[in-house]
Amino acid sequence: MSSNELQHLTDAVAHQMSLVFGEGANLDPATPAGLHRRYSFMFHYRIRLPDGIIKSIIVKIPRDAWMKTLHEAISSDHIRGIITTEFEILNAIADAVEGEPLLCAIRPLAILPEFNAVVMDNVQMRLLKTSLSRFSPTWVNSEDWKQFEGPLELAGKLLRVIHSRFATTQQESLESLRVLENPAESLDALGRHDRSSNALLHPLIDLYESVKSVRVPLAGLHNDYHLGNVFVTPEGKVGTLDPNWTASGCVYVDLACIISYPQTRRVQVLTQGLRFPSSLREPYETALLRGYFTGAQFSYPVLYFYCATAALEKWLYIEDLLRELPRAGSWAASRWVRHYFHGLIRQYLEQGLKASASNRQLDDREHLAPLSCS
């Protein structure tokens, strides 16, 4: 990033903040601290408000993974659309959580369209994924779990509030949503290089056949709702970051993303499932589902179908990353990853089929409970 680009950005931030906070609001003259993430450029500024209080803000400029320079990000029409949507969605989420004492949201202060940037408060927070490091593979401290369980349940509640805010009146069957096409094609493609992947296709189809007539609610989706994008403040309030927004989709997509996260994050894959204790899997799911459904009926077979497809998507994502390694290393790592995901996806499919066989789902004629904030 050139010094001229940074200065132009700083000038724009200073001007916008004087409009937001009034004349006399001044940026700290020190150069802003930059933090470059895989999908964003971020800059930390400090503002002295007219009353003398120092306020910390973040300027975020999204980028695609291939974008190496700030110029590429700020000149992209694609990124301009993303930042406009994010600004609107974050404001709508902030409106939705008002009145919820244990939920919070980061309301954007301003948008800088000429820089494809959004300006936000720098909120003190801890990402929920950091809590996973507290749990030993062989022993779980009950106090550590209790401190994690409360925010986890609130994460489920927050997702419900978001879905309720962006719910549609539609309910569609899984068959009409054509949810089998992509995972079936993915398994077929994987099977060309590894025949054992074909063994997952039949149970996937069997589970799909058992749930294809179940009708599910549609809503706007966060589409990246996992413990790395859910935070807790020092006051114990829970909020979310970085929506990868989809205007309408099955709510189980977001649920499966966060439920499968401890099982599909890279450190768990590399340790072949040892990092997240298997004893925590059921209470982890239960806390999230309790927060989201608050006692309402839902379909376990549908949930596990989506968990299986979420795990499959993560498998494909990691395989793409491995292709960047030297060929010998890529081949060995791919076998390691394949072994892990075979087992995980099979578990989800078997759980779904078992739940289906025991009627642990809604009758085909029933709908899921309407989306409404409790």
Regions found by a protein language model. Give the residues of each.
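Conserved NTP-binding catalytic cores of kinases and kinase-like/nucleotidyltransferase enzymes
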Residues: M1-E114, T233-V238, Q361, R365-S374
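An alpha-helical support segment within catalytic cores of ATP-dependent transferases
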Residues: T10-D28, A167-N223, D364-H367
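Short, flexible/disordered intra-domain loops and linkers
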Residues: W66-I82, S133-E143, V267-L280, E324-A333
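Conserved kinase catalytic-core helix
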Residues: A92-G99, R126-S173, V211
